[in-house]
């Protein structure tokens, strides 16, 4: 029983699908991030843009005219979100197909002076980590116990989605492996047939040559 509890705890820790980082982009540069997301899972992206100030040699809050164009594509390369946001915001979308989702960001401004840079702070949260439970408790008037039960139910639901996604990946990998093995087999058979045909042709050619020279 204790070992089962430890396994569940480790699995819950592994599901902590949130990452915070920052990156620099230039005027026309495009940055993309890949996030593996199960189906019917909420993803929230928080970002903040800072503009490089050469006078202070640091990054300052960007002007209101500078924003970010955000584009999200699902595992089928279908655009599920594409629009221009302000210099700081919160983006939310729900996946409808499991797999790799590509989140791309680039500036909507092309009027910067030469050498300007943007620093973009980015935080991506997936699954139950994207839910604001304080807001949920206030909106639905939940007690502390009810809220905790709600969190546990969401975690179980996320674990189920993750398991289904892993099964989906295993099935896709197995299908790819079987397809590759089948192609290798047919290619080997084709090579064998070609070699046999070439050997047969060479034997007939040599026989004709020897007969022409009256050696046989």
Curated annotation (Swiss-Prot):
A motif (Prevents secretion from ER) lies at residues 213-216. Its main location: endoplasmic reticulum. This is Transmembrane emp24 domain-containing protein eca. Residues 204-216 are cytoplasmic. One of its GO terms (biological process) is dorsal/ventral pattern formation. The chain crosses the membrane at residues 184-203. The lineage of its organism: Eukaryota, Metazoa, Ecdysozoa, Arthropoda, Hexapoda. It comes from Drosophila willistoni. GO terms for cellular component: endoplasmic reticulum membrane. The keyword Ion transport does not apply.
